[in-house]
């Protein structure tokens, strides 16, 4: 059986102050997904940086085990926001507002790296060779307009990601994580929690009416 080739992929923000590596990555080591949920669109609106979402409001993310992620430069520039007290931890570069990753907690072993942070100098074709194409689209009910292609059934995508999550949990691949302290399990940076008013102003329906 041929050995699956893996590679270390550079990570970096637009201003170059925050960078690192995704270790031992292949098309089967994670799951590339496009998410159209209103929370991801709200986060993109909060960052106010072009190119985070596609024309339909989708965010291209790569779900991998946190232990594969190394932030080697500019870690002091890492910032975090939560859309609510129970929301995901959403990480970005404080300087240029490039989104880095979404995580749930120390105990849930996944990190959704933003495509804009993964090998930012690579072309889309080169990225697909390394990571594979998106395996599907989720939360398409929040998409802006009609998607050009019929999306994969969401259940199939969720089941695939669930299998990966179970594997990472069983193998302890959630630690070490650059986003949470190994000893205390606290987030690496104190998150800013948006107020209900701030969050409401960022919702897709609010932005479309402004």
Give residue spans per PLM region.
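A short Gly-Trp-Pro
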Residues: 1-12, 18-210
């Amino acid at each position: 059986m041929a050995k699956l080739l893996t590679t270390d992929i550079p990570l970096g923000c637009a201003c170059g102050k925050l960078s690192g590596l995704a270790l031992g990555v292949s098309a089967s080591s994670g799951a590339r997904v496009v998410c159209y949920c209103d929370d991801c669109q709200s986060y993109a609106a909060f960052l106010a940086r072009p190119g985070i979402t596609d024309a339909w409001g989708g965010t291209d993310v790569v779900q991998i085990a946190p232990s594969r992620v190394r932030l080697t430069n500019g870690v002091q520039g890492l910032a975090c926001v939560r859309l609510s007290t129970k929301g995901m931890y959403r990480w970005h570069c404080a300087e240029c507002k490039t989104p880095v990753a979404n995580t749930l907690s120390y105990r849930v072993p996944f990190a959704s790296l933003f495509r804009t942070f993964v090998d930012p100098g690579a072309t889309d074709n080169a990225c697909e060779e390394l990571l594979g194409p998106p395996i599907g689209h989720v939360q398409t009910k929040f998409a802006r307009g009609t998607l050009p292609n019929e999306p994969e059934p969401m259940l199939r995508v969720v089941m695939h990601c669930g299998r990966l999550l179970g594997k990472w949990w069983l193998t302890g691949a959630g630690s070490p994580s650059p986003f949470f302290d190994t000893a205390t399990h606290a987030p690496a940076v104190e998150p800013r929690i948006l107020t209900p008013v701030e969050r409401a102003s960022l919702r897709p329906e609010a932005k479309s009416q402004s």
